[in-house]
Amino acid sequence: MKKTKLILFGIILAAFTSTATYAAEKFKVITTFTIIADMAKNVAGDAAEVSSITKPDAEIHEYQPTPGDIKRAQGAQLILSNGMHLETWFKRFYENMKNVPEVTVTTGIVPMGITEGPYNGKPNPHAWMSPDNGLIYVDNIRDALVKYDPENADTYMHNAEVYKQKITATIEPLREQVEKVPVEQRWLVSSEGAFSYLARDLGLKELYLWPINSDQEGTPQQVRKVVEQVRKYHIPAVFSESTVSDKPARQVARETGSHYGGVLYVDSLSSENGPVPTYIDLLKVTTGTVVKGLLDGMSNK
């Protein structure tokens, strides 16, 4: 009798443990880089587990996935990518992900084109740098989660609306910051041409050393072209990005007497303890750095 009770107890315990484990398992989402991951986490809340293939502060254009990346991605039930030729490495990576649906989160965005270099005519992939486009990213992420994890559809739809309100609330303050700078001085000079969408939205004229990070970076011809333009228009500041060398931008500043305004964030978020741990932080910090750099450059002349 005792033995029977013990066996019965063991069966019940095993069933309870199995049920608890199953209940604890969350829908698993993998994203190609940290910015999409942050957006997806805001939409998913506690209903899904979201992680990024690339790490914080990574250069994402020509990232080389590791065996560890592939291992971590195993078991994913959904993959979210940017598209627009951003993740040049992703096609080969995806070959290892059998039967996992992949959703491109830039669907519906009207791309700005790259107008020079070997990528001339291709879409500029940095569409998230427009807060208005950011809202489209969120809608696409929401729709993907609802489609592939319908049990949590209400959660995803509610969280997406809350998050979109937060993004929308940042837009006007960003524009107000830029208005502190005289119109003729509103330039965004950077290493990579990654800020076209932000410059357009905020009324900034754009100038860059190279169009995209997978192109040649900091050649003498690129530096000379920007030096000439900075001198011609008396541009007060130049900037570089967090994932590339600041030497070419500093060289432009040195040769023109322009102010080096600091580091801008675009391709990756920082770690949690860094300056831009979230997408909204990235928009705020990058815009704030541009405005401060321009104003400091004007005061130094």
Language-model segment annotations:
Residues 23-301:
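Extracytoplasmic metal-acquisition and chelation regions
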Residues 1-8:
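Bacterial N-terminal signal peptides that target proteins for export
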Residues 8-18:
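Bacterial N-terminal signal peptides
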